[in-house]
């Protein structure tokens, strides 16, 4: 690894419709094979679906969903003298949101609704109410960290 200067983070442009960088990042994660317009259609469709269900602003639902899915701690494998320990470590803020988005998307892709926009809307609504597969994933991660608390002194 080079030990020179730290590579600057690239700024993501705010979303044209809602003016949110978070939404742009989410669209980038939904996007496959560089098809941004398709990803935007899915994302906006999901947000419109949330709005039509009579909820507060869809961006608030998205933010609460991400807040409820963000993990505080995770486990990382650490090899110590032939044995591999699952060491609990705190998650950096940027990684928290990235993991939350990834887990929301994975959970949405596994749902049974007909279109991806409906699946994503359903998963976001579930997550904003602290239920659903994405929230379960976070709870499982926290449970793993809690179970391996004894190895926390192996942190690096």
Curated annotation (Swiss-Prot):
* Role summary: One of the primary rRNA binding proteins, it binds directly to 16S rRNA where it nucleates assembly of the head domain of the 30S subunit. Is located at the subunit interface close to the decoding center, probably blocks exit of the E-site tRNA.
InterPro entries assigned: Ribosomal_uS7, Ribosomal_uS7_bac/org-type, Ribosomal_uS7_CS, Ribosomal_uS7_dom, Ribosomal_uS7_dom_sf
| A single MF term (Gene Ontology) | structural constituent of ribosome
The UniProt entry's GO biological process terms, in alphabetical order, are: translation
Source species of the chain: Alkalilimnicola ehrlichii (strain ATCC BAA-1101 / DSM 17681 / MLHE-1)
Q: What name does the UniProt record give this protein? A: Small ribosomal subunit protein uS7
Superkingdom, according to UniProt? Bacteria
User: Which terms are listed as keywords in the entry?
Assistant: Ribonucleoprotein, Ribosomal protein, RNA-binding, rRNA-binding, tRNA-binding
Keyword flag Ribosomal protein: yes
Matching entries from SUPFAM superfamilies are given as: Ribosomal protein S7
Q: One of this protein's Pfam families, by short name?
A: Ribosomal_S7
Q: Quote the CDD domains the UniProt record gives.
A: uS7_Bacteria
Q: Which residues form a coiled coil?
A: none
What does the subunit comment say?
Answer: Part of the 30S ribosomal subunit. Contacts proteins S9 and S11.
